[in-house]
Design a protein with these regions (language model features):
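Residue-level marker of regulatory loop/turn positions in helix-turn-helix DNA-binding domains and
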Residues: 21, 50, 74
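Short acidic, glycine/Ser/Thr-rich loop/turn "cap" segments at secondary-structure junctions
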Residues: 88, 111-114
Length: 175
């Protein structure tokens, strides 16, 4: 099994938690806590040309964003609309992209999550670096392909995340 043969659609998480861009960081933080997740995709409702109401992914809030806000010790930020502090523009990938495409995008953009959006704009899932690591670690062929691939040289942070996940996985299996 090669990195190019595994499609994003086969490993993405299909249940994605979203909130509208008028929510506060406090509301988003509560959503993250209640759902035990590290990010929330931010959507904006709009009316398409055919007068059908649709949602468009316009940003993302991650646990890092929340820590940055809380760490500022400025309680007024908790009540700002999330659209003022979310990461944007959104970097996404399509469901037909390969695992290799997802890895390269994450590494080049220095991100850990990619919303999976169909070409016509419909959100269908999310893929994380953790999802990618899990596939690589749990399949010898994929691990071998990954190690021997000519991927863009791994950045320090990407390599750290991979080795951290790998060591956590090994520790978990030995308990």
């Amino acid at each position: 099994m090669s990195l190019e043969s595994i499609l994003v659609s086969s490993i993405m998480t299909k249940k994605v938690i979203v909130q509208t861009d008028n929510q506060t960081i406090q509301a988003i933080s509560n959503t993250m806590y209640e759902n035990n997740i590290g990010n929330v995709l931010i959507i904006r409702n709009y009316v398409a040309q055919d007068s059908i109401k649709q949602d468009k992914v316009v940003g993302i809030i991650t646990e890092r964003d929340v820590v940055r806000i809380v760490g500022s010790f400025d309680p007024t930020l908790y009540h700002l609309p999330v659209r003022e502090i979310m990461s944007k523009p959104i970097i996404s990938i399509t469901p037909t992209c390969s695992l290799r495409d997802a890895m390269e995008t994450m590494q080049l953009k220095n991100i850990r999550r990619l919303p999976v959006i169909e070409p016509e704009g419909k959100l269908v899932g999310i893929i994380t670096s953790r999802d990618l690591f899990k596939i690589i670690i749990n399949n010898q062929d994929t691990m071998s392909t990954f190690i021997n691939s000519n991927l863009v040289p791994l950045s320090g942070e990407f390599y750290e995340r991979f080795t951290q996940y790998w060591s956590d996985d090994i520790l978990h299996k030995t308990r």
